[in-house]
Amino acid sequence: MAPERLRSRALSAFKLRGLMLRGEAVKYLTEALQSINEIELEDALEKIIDAVEKQPLSSNMIERSVVEAAVQECSQSVDETIDHIFNIIGAFDIPRFVYNSERKKFLPLLMTNHPAPNLFGTARDKAELFRERYTILHQRTHRHELFTPPVIGSHPDESGSKFQLKTIETLLGSTSKIGDVIVLGMITQLKEGKFFLEDPTGTIQLDLSKAQFHSGLYTESCFVLAEGWFEDQVFHVNAFGFPPTEPSSTTRAYYGNTNFFGGPSNTSVKTSAKLKQLEDENKDAMFVFISDVWLDQVEVLEKLHIMFSGYSPAPPTCFILCGNFSSAPYGKNQVQALKDSLKTLADIICGYPNIHQSSRFVFVPGPEDPGFGSILPRPPFAESITNEFRQRVPFSVFTTNPCRIQYCTQEIIVFREDLVNKMCRNCVRFPSSNLDIPNHFVKTVLSQGHLTPLPLYVCPVYWAYDYALRVYPVPDLLVIADKYDPFTLTNTECLCINPGSFPRSGFSFKVFYPSNKVVEDSKLQGF
């Protein structure tokens, strides 16, 4: 393409996004894009502008150095290496993005005035934790077709089916009765026995005597859409519902190729044609999920022997072993007992050379394993416990709880916590149908966009690292390893599984095939 035409196209593309290029920057960009054909030019410019906007910009006048950095980032993302195929991402390595309401986009932490996260959080971190949860759900709800403002000149019936979110401040400022209002807020119990709704603008007392609850587990500290009327400083609730969920593809349509998930890739792996091709071609790839691997129980070790001998001819890509790794979690000898148990497991694995050389082993600590108490995210086991095992089984990774796994273009979140029980115990009102608890549970987690929509005194979280527990954008596979009965569900284009407790459920586990997104229920009973 002629340099003048290329220059004109580049300037126009930047202008459309409210950016101006300095002369040197235009010259560099024209040279860099000279080899690209006209069909690919528009996509290339879009990617470069996205990379420019990720950088901390002091003004809309773009310097050459900024464009150079953006071009370099884009050229790296095109040249995917083997490192991008399989990655285990610890909770403390997940990138943090903060939603900017003015720019209507997520900004990386460096481009905000937020400090770097610290385990010993400040009061601001605690308040920010709930504000960010609210903001993410608010922007997601606002984009839903029921809450988008009607188009000017649209049919009256269409306008009538739209809803408008109100803030609590709006209600508190009114002296008269307000009917048919919908408010997005968090359920709290500020006084014993009295529930309130809270948002960044204020709190309001709730009257739940006539409230109807849609499907889900409505716990304290979860965010709800409350519909009802306001009178005498009390919000009388007719119905409670959860904020609408959103498929990952819809989220990415708004926020482009930003890598929210983490890992070495600068951009989201979802956009990579190379990785997608590798994923489709490798039909033998499989992930085995096992929870409550009690290594101190002879019967569990025998079943692992049977499992490894069965898989030895065609080793899985990865075994994900979740805690607890001991049936007797407490005691002065707990750490030494775990080291001995891991040594026994290493002996078993080394007895199957195919698995030892081909499969990866990922260890996710459980709530009663040795470590730093019950606060999430939970760090991996201490190196002093795992050193010997890692030397003998080099393809092993001891990671955090929760953790993330990226395989080609697929995103997997793994979380070991007895969450179903906690959420059922802390419900504002328990669902009438006990049989459908897994559906209620999965809907709640995905609607909240968070792994633990519970009060902090029930499920403590490091305030500054709360973002590591987000389930937004929705992953391809969500594994919540719980002692509750095993289940497999699909909701919002997301597969949600619970492998169940290995010893308690008759030695059941789950097998996931990424190439066709199929989950297989497996059991070792009767062997």
From Swiss-Prot:
Gene Ontology MF annotations: DNA binding
InterPro entries associated with the record: DNA_pol_a/d/e_bsu, DNA_pol_e_bsu_N, POLE2
Alphabetically ordered keywords of this record: DNA replication, DNA-binding, Nucleus
GO cellular component: epsilon DNA polymerase complex
Pfam families hit by this protein: DNA_pol_E_B, Dpoe2NT
Gene3D superfamilies the record matches: 1.10.8.60, 3.60.21.60
Subcellular location(s) per record: Nucleus
GO biological process: DNA-templated DNA replication; error-prone translesion synthesis
Task performed by this protein: Accessory component of the DNA polymerase epsilon complex. Participates in DNA repair and in chromosomal DNA replication.
Further remark: In eukaryotes there are five DNA polymerases: alpha, beta, gamma, delta, and epsilon which are responsible for different reactions of DNA synthesis.
Family: Belongs to the DNA polymerase epsilon subunit B family.
Subunit structure: Component of the DNA polymerase epsilon complex consisting of four subunits: the catalytic subunit POLE and the accessory subunits POLE2, POLE3 and POLE4.
Name of this chain's protein: DNA polymerase epsilon subunit 2
Organism field: Bos taurus (Bovine)
Gene coding for it: POLE2
